[in-house]
Amino acid sequence: VERLVEKGGPSRYVSNYAVAGVSAFSTRLLDLLEKYGTMEQTIEKMIEEKMTVTAVVWEKEWAEFTWPWDILKANRLVVDNLLKGKGSFIAESADVHNSAVLEGPVYIGKDVVVRPGATLRGPVYIGNNVYVGNNALIRDYASLCDGVHIGYAVEVRNSMIFDKVNVGRMTYIADSIVGANSCIEAGAQMWNWRPGKKPLFIDDDGEKVQIPFRKFGAMIGDNVVLGVNSSIYPARRIGEGSSIAPGCVIDQDIPPYSEVSVKQVLEIRPISEETDQCE
């Protein structure tokens, strides 16, 4: 290795190779790292001091994690490698009702329960100890990690739902990421596109970054409570530990450990006792 260059746009393209993140160095690295602060600067200094720095070429597929949507790209890579050309896998301990519909390749882990009327339209990954309720639709690269609970008539599409998430009935999750131990209550909706095919952006320290997909939903951290009938605009982030009250419409990013509610004013007017309310 002659030098390292921080990645940038096409104008800074200098090599066909990228650092994939796995390294092995002598303990000398620790002394230099304490002095120079970053791994990149430290390796550059080792090269300047004529220390031997070599690279091993990884010739298989790999996934880079820079932006939240990279999780969905990596999920597709993993699911494809797990299922494509191999057919479906269903663990012996899984309880899949005979009226459930399985289409395309699906992976179903240990002690999974799939209730009557549910549809799994692959490619789909279902981890261990997952419950999929009646009439749920899990499709198109949806991945449910261990211990996830999916309620009645929930739809999940192209999303990554991490361990022990509880999703209430009639919720819609598409092109989204839901962190572990979160509770998505009944009727929550995660919008994933803007009308007119308008591009989607996220804010990165004050700079707008365009998302490279027309559809992208919510990014929800660990231990979040998303209240009944709440809705999230496309490409919005909810930080870990936050609590969203029922009925909120989330049109901006929510910082970690925030409590969000909506102000409501009830108007109560008298009506005649003779009024037939069902007419």
Where are these regions (language model features)?
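Glycine-rich hexapeptide-repeat left-handed beta-helix
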Residues: 151-279
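Catalytic-core segments of class I nucleotidyltransferases/pyrophosphorylases
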Residues: 2-83
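Periodic glycine anchor positions in long extracellular repeat architectures
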Residues: 91-94, 109, 127, 179, ...
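Acidic, glycine-rich loop-and-beta core segments that form the ion-binding/anion-interacting portion
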Residues: 97-155
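Short, well-ordered turn and helix-capping elements at secondary-structure junctions
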Residues: 5-8, 78, 98-100, 118, ...
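Long, charged amphipathic helices and adjacent flexible linkers at domain junctions
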Residues: 78-100
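A short acidic/small-residue loop/turn micro-motif
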Residues: 9-10, 86, 104, 122-126, ...
